[in-house]
Amino acid sequence: MYMLTILQLEAYRATGDKKYLDRDALEMTSYLDKLQQPNGLFYHAPDVPFFWGRGDGWVAAGMAEILRDLPADHPQRMRIMKGYKTMMASLLKYQGKDGMWRELIDHEEAWPESSSSAMFTFAMMTGAKNGWLDASTNGPSARKGWIAVAGYIDQNSNLTSVCEGTGKKNDLEYYLERKRITGDFHGHAAVLWAASALLR
């Protein structure tokens, strides 16, 4: 819900050709209709019922990005906004007291994961600043997320506690035991997105 949709969105941004934006919106709504769970989150795979942090982070970032460009009267905007708001409401519930989200979002025993936390912060901050979300609720949550994620940047400007690349597996322990990486680009990019949303 990010890797394909962002290509269409960037093609639209580069060319101004609306067909790319329409394709992006159609792809996103198709994914939402098929994959979003009742709690607003997304399984790592249809046959793997775990809400892996960075997997959901891509979805959150993808929806926030397209909503920035999609006109108010676009036929798919309401559907995407509904999916986005449902996801953001769920993420509010699962944010830890430390401001972070867990490597498995709905498992308190999972470790705080920085790349997904930065992605969620980006998506939530974008919504609060654009008036899509209640700023009095989501603004403080996004700010808390940013402060928390910034605390995971080490003295060499590397983000710590980034989950290693993770394929699907229907095994809880497999996810809970994923390695924590320092300096992975999945984390760097997400932090820059969050910073851009804060400054935008």
Model-derived regions: residue spans:
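Solvent-exposed loop and edge beta-strand segments that line ligand/cofactor-binding
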Residues: M1, Y43-A61, A72, Q76, ...
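Long, well-ordered core segments of solenoidal/helical folds
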Residues: K18-L41, M81-G99, S141-N158
